[in-house]
Amino acid sequence: MTQYTPMIQQYLKVKADYQDAFLFFRLGDFYEMFFEDAVKAAHELEITLTSRDGGSSERIPMCGVPYHAAKNYIEQLVEKGYKVAVCEQVEDPKTAKGVVRREVVQLITPGTMMEGRTIDEKENNFLAALTHFEDGSYALACNDLTTGQNTVTLLTGSVEDILLEVYATGSKEIVVDSSFSKDELNKLTETLKMTISYEDATAIPEGLEHLVKNVSQAKLIKAVGRLFNYVIRTQKRSLDHLQPVEIYYTNQFMKIDVHSKRNLELTETLRTKEKTGSLLWLLDKTKTAMGGRMLKQWMERPLIQKERIEERLEMVETFVNDYFLREDLKEKLKEVYDLERLAGKVAFGNVNARDLLQLRRSLLQVPAILEAISLLDNAYAARLIQGADPCESLTELLGRSIQENPPLSIKDGDIIKDGYNDKLDQYRYVSKNGKTWIAELEKRERDITGIKSLKIGYNRIFGYYIEVTKANLGALPEGRYERKQTLANAERFITDELKEKETLILEAEEKIVQLEYDLFTALREEVKVFIPKLQHLAKVISELDVLQSFATVSEEEQFVKPVLTTKREIFIKDGRHPVVEKVLNGKLYVPNDCIMPENMDVFLITGPNMSGKSTYMRQLALVTVMSQIGCFVPATEAVLPVFDQIFTRIGAADDLISGQSTFMVEMLEAKNAIANASERSLILFDEIGRGTSTYDGMALAQAIIEHIHDQIGAKTLFSTHYHELTVLEDSLDQLKNVHVSAIEENGKVVFLHKIQDGAADKSYGIHVAQLAELPDSLIARAKEVLAQLEGQEEIVIPKRVEVKEQEVIPEPVVVKEEPVAIEETKVDNEEESQLSFFGTEQSSKKQDKPVLDAKETAVLTQIKKIDLLDMTPLEAMNELYRLQKKLKKG
């Protein structure tokens, strides 16, 4: 390092402590970057890469950005997942001996950004800290530095459970200890794009102990300690706005895994990853930024306590029924700014006068809001506003201290009102009247000298002066004027009287600016005292905002209040998919019932593509989520149970990036549901098994249906193109066939989008191809092939019968197979009975059990012993292939 100049040596010394961040190194009016930082930053920011002499034999790569524009460049880097260490000059270069002393004053990371375009006003910016313990449990602590919110929870499940919780927070950065498993980190970052940071300290930092008074578990305290230590290390400033840590338990909320949330498009769409087109987009009628954030949090964690859900529903009903109360509340909420983030800016010391003016305008609305809610005959409302302080003394303080239109900068003066401070008023009097005196002096000097062009001016170098053109110099009386500056066409003078007034005026103006700054910083400290009250008030207003939002959208979209039942029954009359209906924008939407009594667990849904099967399935899930966050639902009548979990496999969002095919994703999501679902869960499976061959897919689909029906008992919607599976209705007493209806007119299919009882009578695959405008010649050929195939092969679907333990041979049922594209083994027994899937008649021939040889019986015995739930899809396929080869050997 000794070969470098002292300044570069200083840079390298600072950089050594921030290897994982860009170092913005302050040099005068620029932030400079050197070496690898410069090369990478020039590429990422699209700025010029240059070089400079640093004392070594080779020039050093360098790039820089102006300090006044640095905020924009920092945001660009952080938005891409990088960290930025801001290194400032901490002493005056004029008085410095040698190299100016510099220190990192803040480390800006994706999880600690306070403001900027990366921070959506209606979204939290959570930083997560994860701690792993020897017993296999985890503790997850989260902090939103912009609002001061802190949460912690204990997780005892798998990495998938952690993934769910981190996804629910929307964290862009996660803090772990340096020994954390790299494999587990990879699992997290494969699904969620996050910046990984490290912090080994877990003791609660001094001065923050009061924030964990309600936390007793050592594991939770360690996670919070890791989080707080990282925040302190990166921010290096006041954290007075941090709120007491809230403990929550994941078993208090409905579980919806990451893939299901994406499939259902709860907060963003699958295709664009944007809010528009999601359920959140539809429900968000909030008027405040903090209300918008709370709404998203509610949607990420629907409730499972019936009483809490009903409390919310009753409040929503109150707002729905009282139009004037609702509209008056909305008008007041429009005037409320982001109290949570304003409190954060106060604590961080970067609040300006306009921010405090916004705070005052917000507080002016609070008394009327609290009074209106207090008049409601509602226990939930009374409990909600209990302890809420309107902070009227703060409103009064801000009202008499801050000007109505203050500048953005707090160093330019013109912030504090007249009458707030006596000394400031005196200085302003001198400044204002001093300038008046200057104008009067100019008039008097003109009269005395008779020089009409004489003028008094001012500049920063020479101060006040009397300027006289050279043509008029002879008119000046001798001895009274002292020459100050000579110009080409004029001379500038000063008098003793002007000197005296100049001193008074300039001192007053300087003192005004400094005193206003001092008064403002003192005022800011006074406001800090109110931070806890402001944060409590923010929560009250946020909750009211979400509830009125539910009421507003329920009124506008004609939603109905759901009735919650402790029974395992679903009764939805004229249900609609809320987002699809909204996007149709007035066009006809076909509503559908979903009626599943306690003794009906599985709907097996058939019907052509594009007919609405997936929409119907998503519709039920969204109605359930809406109900359990406390919102009315899109139906004319709804009776719903409280579900503990939702599992879905809808759509074809393959995980190709991580090397997983459609079929693998299907199997993993099916495994997740089978392993974790309870009879209080909701399962939605759309065409499970389509990612493999017909026989394999059909076998797996049937096995999954039977397992859910027999072992789990969860309410399930299972759509399929394997029409042969509809015979399961005969053997599974809690399964019912339903289909999406369609009709054929003049050779064209018309989708009716109506769910009806029974199985579909036709597939309409070629008709869908026609709608997609495939070439006519191709369509014609497909019809020829279909006609040939329809009369060929038959598939034996094992019919479920009650058997004793030693019996291994199922009773077969034969059904006609749809076209397949693989070579299959023909059924030898031509005398087996025929079950026509598309018709209603069934052969009355007696079905004889097939005679199996010893080898076939042995294979069946092996199949019976296989534990499919304990195998991966690949292992299952390999085992199936091995058994097939065994049967084919002569």
UniProtKB/Swiss-Prot annotation:
Region: Disordered, residue numbers: 832-851
Residues holding ATP: G607, P608, N609, M610, S611, G612, K613, S614
GO molecular function: ATP binding; ATP-dependent DNA damage sensor activity; damaged DNA binding; mismatched DNA binding
One family name in Pfam for this protein: MutS_III
Keywords: ATP-binding, DNA damage, DNA repair, DNA-binding, Nucleotide-binding
Positions of disulphide bridges: none
Cited SUPFAM superfamilies: DNA repair protein MutS, domain I (SSF55271), DNA repair protein MutS, domain II (SSF53150), DNA repair protein MutS, domain III (SSF48334), P-loop containing nucleoside triphosphate hydrolases (SSF52540)
CDD domains: ABC_MutS1 (cd03284)
Keyword Protein biosynthesis: no
GO biological process, one term: mismatch repair
GO cellular component, one term: cytosol
Cited function: This protein is involved in the repair of mismatches in DNA. It is possible that it carries out the mismatch recognition step. This protein has a weak ATPase activity.
Family under the similarity heading: Belongs to the DNA mismatch repair MutS family.
Protein name in the entry: DNA mismatch repair protein MutS
Record organism: Bacillus cereus (strain 03BB102)
Gene name of the encoded protein: mutS
